Amino acid sequence: MNMRYTLMPERREGPVDPMPQSPSPSDEGGGPRRPETGSPDKDNLLKRMRKVDPKQAERYRQRTGE
């Protein structure tokens, strides 16, 4: 049985940046962004909750002190 081994050159590592900077979304110019949403109005939230589940809305009012 005749075996041949091919010698591979040793792997060289190039200079490494000690602090690689991750690209920020503003640098890339594209990509998804977090939507600008404020907290929902509490009265509006309670009205919507009452439509869906009145008992849950009542428990939420008691829990939050509304």
From Swiss-Prot:
GO terms for molecular function: protein tag activity. Residues 30-66 have a biased composition (Basic and acidic residues). Residues 1-66 are annotated as: Disordered. There is a cross-link at residue 66 (Isoglutamyl lysine isopeptide (Glu-Lys) (interchain with K-? in acceptor proteins)). Keywords: Isopeptide bond, Ubl conjugation pathway. It holds the Pfam family UBact. May function as a protein modifier covalently attached to lysine residues of substrate proteins. This may serve to target the modified proteins for degradation by proteasomes. Belongs to the ubiquitin-like protein UBact family. NCBIfam families: ubiq_like_UBact. This is Prokaryotic ubiquitin-like protein UBact.
